[in-house]
A protein has these predicted regions:
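Short phosphate-binding loop-to-helix
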Residues: 63-85
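A contiguous pocket-lining binding segment that forms or flanks enzyme active sites
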Residues: 112-145
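Short Gly/Thr/Asp-enriched flexible loops that form oxyanion-binding sites at enzyme active sites
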Residues: 101-112
Length: 210
């Protein structure tokens, strides 16, 4: 998935980057995510936030100071910035855990925000990856746990192949977690939705096939 990607480093739990950004990528440090960048020798192209977590705006040549009272979270503002610059793949680190569980939920919702704009986002935790798809499909390869949730009302045409529990052209809703506690059962698995959006979680050792 390398090439022209936007990395967003937030203030939640951070366990290092799975891939190293290259010159065509864009790295945004959101608030206290700047400290993770500094400690891990990651050079951000942009630092933004209201800096309520960091305490003060850092000394950086490209800082955007946001107001404390605003509609966008720092992460959402970072996503909007990346979209405006033409990036379609978003790798979000430091977006889970931390002291604010509300921000974890907000960041999961942000994956749907990205998918609604025909882009893809991945939210990395210590042992898992979260992503969202809309009216599309993904292929997974590897071993481990997988979970699939409807995150936006009703999802139709949901097909799960290559998993322990499969579905074929099913309809699932956001008020019942039918897709929890699944796992890879074949070398490759496919998750598809023809009408709606899905939130997908898979173990960190599982990869997506292009």
């Amino acid at each position: 998935m390398n090439g022209h990607e936007c990395y967003i480093i937030g203030a939640g739990d951070f366990f290092g980057l799975r891939e190293i950004p290259d010159d065509s990528d864009y790295v945004i440090a959101a608030d206290a995510g700047y400290e993770y960048c500094r400690k891990n020798n990651i050079i951000p192209d942009l630092v933004l936030g209201d800096f309520d977590s960091l305490g003060a705006a850092p000394k950086h040549p490209n800082v955007v100071q946001l107001p404390v009272e605003k509609d966008d979270t720092d992460t959402v503002f970072a996503i909007k910035t990346g979209l405006e610059k033409g990036y379609r793949h978003f790798y979000i680190y430091g977006g889970l855990g931390g002291k604010r569980s509300d921000h974890t939920i907000a960041n999961l919702q942000s994956l749907l925000y990205i998918a609604n704009r025909k882009a893809r986002g991945w939210l990395f935790g210590e042992n898992c990856v979260w992503t969202a798809i809309k009216n599309s499909s993904i292929s997974l390869k590897g071993e481990g746990s997988v979970a699939v949730f409807c995150f936006d009302g009703i999802a139709r045409g949901v097909t799960l192949k290559g998993l322990k529990y499969e579905l074929n052209n099913a309809e699932i809703s956001s008020d019942f977690p039918i897709g929890v506690s699944n796992s890879m059962a074949a070398e490759e698995a496919t998750i598809e939705v023809t009408d709606g959006a899905l939130l997908v979680m898979y173990d960190i050792g599982i990869g997506e096939e292009n």
